[in-house]
Amino acid sequence: MSATDLVSELGARFGDAVLGEQTTRERFPTVWIRPEASAAVHRYLKHEVERPFRMLVDLWAIDETARKHREGQPPSGITIASHLMSHERNADIRLKVGLDAEYPSAKSIAGVYPNAAWYEREAYDMFGVEFEAQPHSLRILLPPGWEGHPMRKTQPGRATERPLFNMTAALFDAKEHALAADPEKFGLPTHRDGVELMILNYGPHSMATHGVFRIVLALDGEEIVAARPDIGFHHRGAEKMAERQTWHNFLPYTDRVDYLGGVMGEMPYLQAVEKACGITVPDRALTVRVMLSEMFRIMNHLLFYGTMAQDTGAMSPVFYMFVDRERGYRVIEAITGARMHPGYFRIGGLSMDLPQGWDRLVREFLDWMPARLADYEGMVLRNEIFQARTKGVAAYDTAMALDWGVTGPGLRATGSAWDVRKARPYSGFENFEFEIPVGHNGDCYDRTVVRVEEIRQSLKIIRQCVDNMPSGPIKADHPLTTPPPRERMLHDIETMIHHFVGASWGPVLPPGETTGQVETVRGLTQFALISDGEPSSYRTRIRTPSFPHLQMISAVAPGMMVADLVAYLGSIDYVMSDVDR
């Protein structure tokens, strides 16, 4: 069934509740539906349609009140967009619902897609959208006492535009009291079988939480009866920043959404921007992008490997693996000029070409790693204590993973070989030979094994990049390539003007909506961009994998011991900047 057939099927099934299809540059349909039909349409697409859309990838809000280019779209003050995926079809569909701008209200779809709950809370937090039947209508990224909804167009985008903030002693006490672990507020039980449960704050300063993040637990002894993750302590307003930076100037921020992913965070953003511009990136630049992305995958997975061993009682491996990471970062630094956040990619290509001798450095790293990985297998994967702490712990199957929006190694550990690099190749990944490691049990052990095997596959991909690096330009010959090639600046007045405008004002993208999807170190990262014909984004939506992965804790943790929760958190491999943005 084609995308057109699917839209026709929805129209036949729901009649005038389907308002029509929006014209976009996407490879998937975007369909507007009436608010009252939202739950029914989502339920149909998940449970009734042939080869159903089992995963809610993302749900977000758009403030349409200042938008100038909305041709062909129904009236809407606040729009709710939901992005669904069918792995069986290898296809997506986006649904949109138009709401009133002053008092936006919509029906919750958390009863259809469980992972919608946090996305709906975020839409309330940032835009003020009330969702009927939402089980926890709480703020999620902002503190409980926050006033207003900062992603609305009427809200300021800079601290200097807000009143002076003064943290008085009374205000500090009030904010501290608001963060108390109130079981009623978090929807936690206080008794089981007539026995009072202990309410425990797990974090936000525990080393086991891997960042500023807490879980409020209801415990019967050491057994977890219920768990409620509490996030937002690391929120920095990345999506709001995108609205006041030019398309070019926002690039360094993408490195810091997942601060361990490096250049990989730049890829989905640039995909969407380059699609909007109609830019074809040269082969050399595409191959360099692949090579550096896989280098950062290895850097991340080595950190995961070492800290996972440390979380389960092995102290030595993490020190050995930091030696390997230092070698890798020296290669990255030699090529890009920086280590963790290079900002190396550009709209249309790269910031600069590969330096002389780059291939020798990369080959030395490739030759170094295999023996090290073999040593670590004995230290960690074949270690009886590690196996006892991880096998059968925090296990879930593919169906549950899809219900909660799990992607990346967490999904592949259940036996699903879904990987964007294979299913929807980008940046030339279709030209590389590599396997997709999968597990079978979906437990902590399999999630570790999958990431270790991914290191080996990344080494294989990088070696192919070195052996087959194309020659040619590193930037596209396109007027919106930013910044334009400097060597052409003084040829004539036209090229000089293009360079001046590109370097100072930045490119102006045509109005429209585009999406970029990449298999980052933690799973599917998606940037959904709206251009209104300005030098800056009208709306930048950043879908990160860590956000739904933490939401799933409330479904997986009950029944396990507190010590098992440590192993489970380590096996998720989340980064709080990736969660809170």
Curated annotation (Swiss-Prot):
Record's subcellular location? Cell inner membrane
- One Pfam family of this protein, by short name? Complex1_30kDa
Q: Name one GO molecular function term.
A: NADH dehydrogenase (ubiquinone) activity
Reaction catalysed by this enzyme = a quinone + NADH + 5 H(+)(in) = a quinol + NAD(+) + 4 H(+)(out)
> What UniProt keywords apply to this chain's record, in alphabetical order?
Cell inner membrane, Cell membrane, Membrane, Multifunctional enzyme, NAD, Quinone, Translocase, Transport, Ubiquinone
**Where is region (NADH dehydrogenase I subunit D) located?**
196-581
Q: Which Gene3D superfamilies match?
A: Cytochrome-c3 Hydrogenase, chain B (1.10.645.10), NADH:ubiquinone oxidoreductase, 30kDa subunit (3.30.460.80)
Family matches, as InterPro entries: NADH_DH_suCD, NADH_Q_OxRdtase_suD, NADH_quin_OxRdtase_su_C/D-like, NADH_UbQ_OxRdtase_30kDa_su, NADH_UbQ_OxRdtase_49kDa_CS, NDH1_su_D/H, NiFe-Hase_large
Q: What is its EC number?
A: 7.1.1.-
Q: Which domain of life is it from?
A: Bacteria
Membrane-crossing ranges are: none
Catalytic EC class = translocase
Q: What does this protein do?
A: NDH-1 shuttles electrons from NADH, via FMN and iron-sulfur (Fe-S) centers, to quinones in the respiratory chain. The immediate electron acceptor for the enzyme in this species is believed to be ubiquinone. Couples the redox reaction to proton translocation (for every two electrons transferred, four hydrogen ions are translocated across the cytoplasmic membrane), and thus conserves the redox energy in a proton gradient.
| Name of the protein | NADH-quinone oxidoreductase subunit C/D
Q: Which gene encodes it?
A: nuoC
